[in-house]
Amino acid sequence: MSRIGNKVITLPAGVEIINKDNVVTVKGPKGELTREFNKNIGITVEGTEVTVTRPNDSKEMKTIHGTTRANLNNMVVGVSEGFKKALEMRGVGYRAQLQGSKLVLSVGKSHQDEVEAPEGVTFEVPTPTTINVIGINKESVGQTAAYVRSLRSPEPYKGKGIRYVGEFVRRKEGKTGK
């Protein structure tokens, strides 16, 4: 991970970082994110460049170093561009619709599943079988998309279910009759 940690993060225009006792706040055009990092890791901001340093070369510090740099970079990308996960639904009668900030899913159950959007995450339904999960925090966007997918994950025989756009679902052959 140390190779990732040694890379410098370049700040895009309109993004500023405030570091106070390793509680980092990143402000940008799309919003503001705050996160606390390990106190042993040094985060220095010089103009439009951010560097992450570690005190020694122990295995633990190397891993924390790379993870800190990756998380900080995700915060910078989130407040400047944002993150989006696209999901698609396959199956007869599988539909999604928005009711306010709630996502209502009909996925072949006796009832409809309702998913409340967590703070900082929004849903978009361009077509009844496509769902976009949008936000500035990469972690919460990914977790929300994974939760929506888990409501009806794709099954291997017909491929019905909710999947990420571009996700390959391994198919199985059905039973062969005698």
UniProtKB/Swiss-Prot annotation:
Keywords: Ribonucleoprotein, Ribosomal protein, RNA-binding, rRNA-binding. One of its GO terms (cellular component) is cytosolic large ribosomal subunit. It comes from the Bacteria. The keyword rRNA-binding applies. This protein binds to the 23S rRNA, and is important in its secondary structure. It is located near the subunit interface in the base of the L7/L12 stalk, and near the tRNA binding site of the peptidyltransferase center. Belongs to the universal ribosomal protein uL6 family. This is Large ribosomal subunit protein uL6. The lineage of its organism: Bacteria, Bacillati, Bacillota, Bacilli, Lactobacillales.
